[in-house]
Regions:
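Alpha-helix termini
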Residues: 23-24, 34-35, 39-45, 87-90, ...
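Acidic catalytic patch
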Residues: 82-120
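Short His-Asn-centered micro-motif
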Residues: 7, 52-55, 146-149
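Helix-adjacent hinge/juxtasegments
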Residues: 70-87
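Acidic, PIN/NYN-like endoribonuclease modules and their adjacent C-terminal/linker elements
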Residues: 1-4, 118, 122, 130-167
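Alpha-helix capping/helix-boundary segments
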Residues: 11, 56, 129, 151-152
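Short, well-structured N-terminal submotif of metal-dependent ribonuclease cores
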Residues: 1-52, 63-75
């Protein structure tokens, strides 16, 4: 089964070293630049396809635009990731694969779902990432959400482990 890695804002900001966003996740499982880089390289070697959701693009650019760091360098590095995704340059999936999620019918469905999940504190960005995860799961991919957000990680589909037959 082919695997996709859906990259969330929290992890992307750590990977880009956005000032103030150098780590993410709970204190007992802190996600650092070293852990992110190691995971990215490991998944590249496995042939995993990386997914850049629209919410991740919008949220990450906002953190970069409001950072106290070198916005020019951060912007250039992030722009290259966006271009690689748009061009489907390995390991990135083509951004256009997600375009059906943003048609009028699916946007209305997202709005209906979100107005219920917002009561529990789910942001619209996370709700849209959940839809990206569902999209790739329905296509038969093994999907991992690479995030420091335990709430979002909870939406990751479980992978069935084959059981040994008894003799």
């Amino acid at each position: 089964m082919r695997k996709v890695l859906v990259i969330d804002t929290s992890v992307l900001c750590v990977w880009l070293k956005v000032p103030g966003k150098e780590t993410c996740g709970p204190s007992n499982a802190l996600v650092t630049y070293e852990k992110v880089s190691e995971k990215i390289e490991e998944e590249k070697k496995k042939g995993t396809t990386f997914i850049l959701p629209l919410a991740t693009i919008i949220e990450t650019e906002n953190h970069i635009a409001h950072s106290s760091g070198d916005r020019m360098s951060l912007g250039e590095e992030f722009a290259q990731i966006m271009i690689d995704s748009a061009d489907e340059k390995s390991p990135w999936a083509a951004f256009t694969e997600q375009s059906s999620l943003w048609n009028p019918e699916n946007l209305k469905k997202l709005a209906e779902k979100w107005k219920i999940t917002v009561i529990g504190g789910q942001a619209l960005g996370d709700a849209s990432i959940v839809e990206v995860v569902k999209y790739y799961t329905d296509l038969g991919y093994e999907v991992e959400i690479f995030t420091g957000d335990e709430g979002l990680k909870a939406y990751e589909p479980t992978v069935e482990i084959p059981r040994r037959r008894r003799k």
